């Protein structure tokens, strides 16, 4: 990453952390890693912030493996080693539970399979974070995710809901 881009990323990260009081002294933060650009950028930003932020905190990266065979985690492992962040993989059978071959399971048919998968992933991640001694979990949600969540909530749940900047673990 270019130096100017990195400074801008760290500046935005610090601003959000300060504005919403997301990090306290001694926090052990689990970072949910999907392998996508958003979660990897969050990990990179928090690892950079950790070097100079006045409140000391530690990070642990966690990926919830849904059980797909072709999910290569090698690049994530390498990045975590470079950033000196412990990395844990939570093996699950979420894909098998939601899908039977090409057919969506009865559990997922009652609602959106995406919503059920998200809830199951979040539960697995939160459980792992607690087991690893983390007191907070960082998700790489951004404004597009807030808007999407609000619309999906209205469509599938009949209510207007969007997640807050922080919730308790």
Residue ranges and their predicted role:
Residues 1-165:
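ATP-dependent adenylation/nucleotidyltransferase module used to activate substrates
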């Amino acid at each position: 990453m270019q130096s100017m881009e990195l400074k801008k990323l760290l500046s935005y990260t610090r601003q959000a952390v300060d504005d919403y009081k997301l990090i306290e002294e001694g926090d052990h933060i689990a970072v949910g890693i999907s392998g996508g650009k958003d979660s990897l950028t969050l990990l990179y930003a928090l690892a950079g912030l950790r070097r100079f932020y006045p409140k000391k905190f530690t990070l642990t990266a966690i990926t919830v493996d849904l059980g797909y065979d072709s999910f290569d985690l090698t690049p994530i492992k390498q990045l975590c080693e470079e950033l000196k962040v412990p990395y844990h993989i939570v093996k699950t059978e979420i894909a098998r539970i939601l899908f039977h071959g090409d057919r969506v399971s009865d559990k997922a048919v009652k609602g959106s399979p995406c919503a059920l998968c998200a809830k199951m992933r979040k539960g697995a991640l939160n459980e792992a974070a607690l087991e690893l001694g983390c007191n907070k979990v960082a998700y790489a949600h951004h404004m597009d995710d807030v808007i999407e969540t609000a619309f999906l909530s209205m469509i599938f749940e009949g209510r207007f809901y969007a997640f807050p900047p922080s919730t308790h673990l």
